[in-house]
Amino acid sequence: NLADIAIVWAQTDEGIQGFVIEKGTPGFTAQEIKHKMSLRASVTSALFFDNVRVPDSSRLPNVKGLKGPLGCLTQARYGITWGPIGAAIACLSEAVDYTKERILFGRPVAATQSAQIKMAEMARRITLAQLLVLQLGRLKDAGTMQPQQVSLAKWNNCRMAIDIARECRDLLGGAGITT
């Protein structure tokens, strides 16, 4: 809905190829997907093609087969490895602020050793995730990043963010489950 172009991969007589489809091309429409359960920070659209014809000049040069779309997917997934880090940092920041203000048995929850250990462990895991994707970025810049490395980083960082979100929810007590 927002983009002026779409990069589309399609099966042709010559195999899978990429095409640039411009907004306004007859037969091409995009419909925003609303009420998503995830990826809510960005607009996602369903693309519809009804007898769309594109000129040969719209074909992506030097890209044939699945290598093109899978390469794009790997690059996109690399970007996704960073998102959970931001989510985990936001959760930890909220937990730190809350535990400093929440008084329990005459002192802030943040003053208890158990809360401090939990928050230090969360900070350690966030730092490890940051270092992981920093190294992955270095490999990407060097042209040696492998898809399986991206998969492992995404898996690690998503798991880390989920674990930290749960731990922070527990630190917030009842405030962690209300709006």
Descriptions of predicted regions:
Residues 1, 39, 75-79:
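Glycine-rich phosphate/pyrophosphate-binding beta-alpha loops
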Residues 1-3, 40-42, 61-62:
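Short glycine/proline-enriched turns and hinge-like loops at secondary-structure junctions
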Residues 1-30:
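A short core secondary-structure module
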Residues 21-26, 56-58, 89:
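Basic, amphipathic alpha-helical recognition segments used for DNA target recognition
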Residues 24-53:
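Flexible, small-/acidic-enriched active-site or ligand-binding loops
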Residues 45-71:
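A short, charged helix-loop
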Residues 46-48, 71-179:
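Alpha-helical interface subdomain recognition
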